[in-house]
């Protein structure tokens, strides 16, 4: 018999993602918290968006927080390697 530990991120009663590592589950949960905050903030934007568009943009911005932070701090895009690595990490985490 095999025993498997699984960490599940649940939002509003819905399973969002499961992980084998508590650290990864906590990071994903924190990213979802950030996306929720961004979604709330974007509702005050002068740009009108459908709810689905705003939610997708909020999630994407939260996923890209390191790149966004670099842009806001330096006024420049990070090197293509950093941007590419961020996208690859996101693809890998969604495959889990």
UniProtKB/Swiss-Prot annotation:
Q: Which organism is it from?
A: Escherichia coli (strain K12)
Which GO cellular component term is one of those annotated?
cytosol
The UniProt entry's GO biological process terms, in alphabetical order, are: DNA repair; response to X-ray; SOS response
Q: Which InterPro entries match?
A: Uncharacterised_YebG, YebG-like_sf
Could you tell me which Gene3D superfamilies the record lists for this protein?
Answer: PSPTO_1197 like
* Record NCBIfam families: PRK10061.1
User: Any idea what this protein is called?
Assistant: Uncharacterized protein YebG
């Amino acid at each position: 018999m095999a025993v498997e530990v699984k960490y599940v991120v649940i939002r509003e009663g819905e399973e969002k993602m499961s992980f084998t590592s508590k650290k990864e589950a906590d990071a994903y949960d924190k990213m979802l918290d950030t996306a929720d905050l961004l979604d709330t903030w974007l509702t005050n934007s002068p740009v009108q968006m459908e709810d689905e568009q705003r939610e997708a943009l909020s999630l994407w911005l939260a996923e890209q927080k390191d790149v966004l932070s670099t842009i806001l701090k330096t006024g420049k895009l990070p090197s293509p390697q950093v941007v590419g690595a961020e996208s690859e990490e996101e693809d890998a985490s969604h495959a889990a």
